[in-house]
């Protein structure tokens, strides 16, 4: 029984960020390799249940930009990339480099460089081990009970406003139903800021104009509507704070961009 509870908690913690207090991954008694293995299993489940987009142009762009960001990160993960056909304005990267982008975010991005900014941010969460750290935090605070309660709430579609969204939220059982719903929502504010900074460097290193990261958040703010706005930014730092931080960090990112062997600027427009 104890083993089953630990396995359940681990599956949730891959993507469900439960708290923001600090602790060390070592305290969790789990290695980066172990959590990457569990993330890979969850990703396979997502792929088996989600509707993969048949938009060849967007799929090729996601693949291309993801590969460039992955290379810029310097991590030798077993990278995988998918484009999910869904209305969510969202993207995520599981531990170990398992990336998903939703078609709903593509029209908001407008440019290839903006996609690089989003992917840079999400990949940074993985490379900075934020998922592993949150597993450690949860274990330290004995969240077994909360994990079980969360599992029983799968399918509740807590963040969804439409029937289609509620249906999509159930995809992939534990990982896609409960975990992915909260993946973007429960990183600490400090984690989000760190991912913004590191992600801006990744996009610049990959050859994309880093100032587009600032314009991206202007467009994301403009895209908000109804209750809560896009999932991708719903609990992230405020738009003004985020743009201010990215502007402050821009000189360092511009230096990375100038040193990049390939410069794509804004890249292709997203149509």
Task: Please annotate each region the language model reported.
Residues 10-18:
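Hydrophobic helical h-region of N-terminal Sec-dependent signal peptides
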Residues 17, 21-271:
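A Zn2+-metalloprotease active-site environment signal
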């Amino acid at each position: 029984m104890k083993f089953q509870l630990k396995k359940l908690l681990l599956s949730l913690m891959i993507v469900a960020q439960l708290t923001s207090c600090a602790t060390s991954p070592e305290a969790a008694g789990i290695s980066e390799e172990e959590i990457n293995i569990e993330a890979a299993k969850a990703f396979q489940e997502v792929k088996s249940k989600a509707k993969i987009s048949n938009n060849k142009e967007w799929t090729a762009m996601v693949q291309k930009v993801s590969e460039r960001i992955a290379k810029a990160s310097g991590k030798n993960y077993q990278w995988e990339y998918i484009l999910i056909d869904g209305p969510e304005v969202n993207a995520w990267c599981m531990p170990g480099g398992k990336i998903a982008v939703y078609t709903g975010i593509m029209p908001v991005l407008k440019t290839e460089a903006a996609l690089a900014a989003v992917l840079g941010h999400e990949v940074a969460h993985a490379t900075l081990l934020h998922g592993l750290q949150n597993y450690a935090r949860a274990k330290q605070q004995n969240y077994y009970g909360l994990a079980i309660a969360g599992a029983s709430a799968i399918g509740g579609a807590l963040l969804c406003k439409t029937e289609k969204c509620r249906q999509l939220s159930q995809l992939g059982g534990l990982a896609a139903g409960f975990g992915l719903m909260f993946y973007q929502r429960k990183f600490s504010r400090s984690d989000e800021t760190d991912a913004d900074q590191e992600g801006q460097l990744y996009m610049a290193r990959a050859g994309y104009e880093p100032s587009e990261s600032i314009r991206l958040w202007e467009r994301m703010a403009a895209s908000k509507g109804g209750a809560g706005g896009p999932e991708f930014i719903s609990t992230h730092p405020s738009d003004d704070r985020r743009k201010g931080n990215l502007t402050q960090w821009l000189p360092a990112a511009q230096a990375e961009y100038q040193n990049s062997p390939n410069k794509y600027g804004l890249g292709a427009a997203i149509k």
